[in-house]
């Protein structure tokens, strides 16, 4: 149905090997690595060490967004983890390590281990989906993490509590050799510059999809639709926020226009179904 191969500057991507009809389930995966709501970033490396070697390699093969500031932050997190482990185990390990021998493994992580720790933190932060369920807060999936972003995606992911899996379905027909895409953003009505800002900060790239190409008629028309929709939503929210009487007709009119914008852009799925 699909294959994972080069997507140019984006790295690897998921492509249709044949026509994928709308509604087809493309992926159904259990988490490779996940955090519970009561866990934090300091638990990521510990959890990764519990993975089977094959799964650990799958995790380390995923790409990540790294900047100088993020690298500095994650090295600090890795060093803090090491120090915390040291002081936690200090009373038990002191007799064994009071005579330092350079050739013997110690309680400190080696430099390579610290590098791996930093890499895993970066990979998790770049690839994790925020599920925010009772059992799982964030999770990384081996195949789904290869799906790249598009502001007008052709697929959508949803977590199934019953199955314990993250499912990705086609929201429209996906042609042979077309790349499968998801939206990494929550605000579907955001303007191009706002979308770029969030994508640059969170993932390190500026989207080059059709909706972001303001040099094309499609891109310009889409941007105008989004501007008009945001203005309409803002006016409605302001009238209600200022104590204005809630008008069912006005609310319905606003929602119908919002749905019209989504449909004109080709955005389907939960965004329309939840209106």
Name each model-derived stretch:
Residues 1-275:
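Conserved catalytic SET/PR domain of SAM-dependent protein methyltransferases, capturing the structural core
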């Amino acid at each position: 149905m699909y294959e994972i191969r080069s997507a140019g500057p984006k790295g690897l991507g998921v492509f249709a090997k044949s026509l994928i009809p709308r509604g087809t389930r493309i992926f159904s995966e259990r988490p490779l690595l996940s955090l519970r709501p009561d866990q934090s970033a300091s638990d990521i490396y510990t959890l990764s060490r519990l993975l089977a070697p094959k799964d650990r390699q799958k995790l380390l093969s995923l790409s990540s967004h790294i900047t100088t500031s993020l690298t500095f932050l994650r090295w600090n997190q890795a060093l803090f983890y090491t120090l915390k482990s040291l002081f936690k185990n200090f009373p038990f390990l002191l007799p064994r390590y009071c005579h330092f021998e350079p050739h013997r493994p110690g309680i400190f992580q080696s430099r390579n281990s610290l590098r791996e720790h930093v890499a895993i933190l970066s990979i998790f932060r770049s690839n994790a989906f925020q599920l925010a369920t009772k059992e799982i807060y964030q999770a990384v999936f081996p195949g789904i993490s290869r799906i790249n972003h598009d502001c007008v995606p052709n697929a959508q992911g949803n977590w199934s509590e019953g199955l314990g899996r993250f499912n990705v379905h086609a929201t429209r027909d996906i042609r042979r050799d077309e790349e499968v895409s998801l939206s990494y953003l929550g605000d579907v009505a955001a303007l191009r510059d706002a979308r770029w800002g969030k994508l640059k900060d969170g993932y390190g790239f500026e989207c080059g999809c059709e909706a972001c190409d303001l040099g094309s008629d499609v891109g310009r028309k889409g941007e105008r639709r989004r501007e008009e929709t945001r203005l309409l939503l803002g006016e409605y929210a302001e009238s209600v926020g200022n104590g204005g009487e809630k008008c069912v007709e006005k609310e319905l009119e606003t929602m119908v226009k919002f749905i019209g914008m989504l449909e004109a852009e080709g955005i389907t799925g939960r965004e329309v179904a939840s209106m």
